[in-house]
């Protein structure tokens, strides 16, 4: 009731995070889905025909799930509360005709999953040793975790021994903000500018973690030029 217009994704998701006021109209958008899509594109990940496991059923989950089903993926949703998972399933099947979505308990996750998406806060700092999963389905090719602190999450660590490609949620966060700025100002951010923001943010996070672990002590860095 507070908006004059709303874009398709925001309408289907029942979620607006950006409002543009122009020509006497208020228009609502959801840029989270754009940030998520760009994260996958950055890693060369195609969803068409892939079997995707989604952990969680909240706001971030709905964004990931919507993009998956609109791109032709077979989606499996799991979580502690299956009723909430089924509610997300219904919302998506109502919004996207032909969406292929199933709901399973964590004990009965299909083994032929290609992509694992974590939308839950499980594993976020400071409880970074907690994990929403204790193993990855054996066909997993890619792991995306919406958490960005720590930059390598407990879910992502499951992929490390297998050399499975992973991505944390910081790029999604940066890109959804960049798209919001474009909607408001018409200015498009160059990819290099976004990469610079990423590097600086990771650096600040690393320094903060060192301070928390060791206190503000003098550190001596040894190594190749620029590596420190």
Please tell me what each predicted stretch does.
Residues 81, 108-130, 144:
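Rossmann-like NAD(P)-binding element
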Residues 21, 141-191:
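Rossmann-fold NAD(P)-binding glycine/threonine-rich loop
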Residues 71-95:
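NAD(P)-binding Rossmann-fold cofactor-contacting core
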């Amino acid at each position: 009731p507070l908006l004059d217009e709303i874009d398709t994704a925001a309408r289907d998701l029942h979620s607006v995070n950006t409002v543009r006021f122009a020509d006497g109209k208020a228009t609502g958008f959801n840029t989270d889905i754009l940030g998520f899509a760009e994260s996958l594109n950055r890693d060369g990940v195609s969803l068409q025909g892939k079997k995707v496991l989604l952990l969680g059923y909240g706001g971030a989950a709905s964004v990931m799930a919507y993009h998956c089903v609109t791109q032709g993926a077979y989606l499996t949703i799991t979580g502690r509360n299956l009723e909430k998972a089924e509610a997300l399933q219904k919302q998506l099947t109502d919004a996207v005709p032909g969406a292929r979505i199933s709901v399973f308990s964590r004990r009965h996750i299909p083994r032929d999953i290609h992509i694992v998406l974590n939308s839950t806060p499980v594993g976020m700092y400071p409880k970074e040793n907690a994990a929403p999963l204790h193993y990855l389905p054996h066909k997993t090719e890619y792991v995306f975790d919406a958490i960005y602190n720590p930059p390598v999450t407990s879910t992502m660590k499951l992929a490390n021994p297998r050399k499975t490609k992973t991505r944390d949620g910081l790029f999604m966060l940066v890109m959804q903000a960049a798209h919001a700025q474009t909607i408001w100002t018409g200015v498009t951010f160059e990819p290099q500018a976004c990469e610079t923001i990423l590097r600086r943010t990771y650096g600040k996070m690393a320094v903060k973690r060192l301070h928390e672990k060791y206190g503000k002590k003098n550190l001596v860095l040894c190594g190749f030029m620029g590596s420190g």
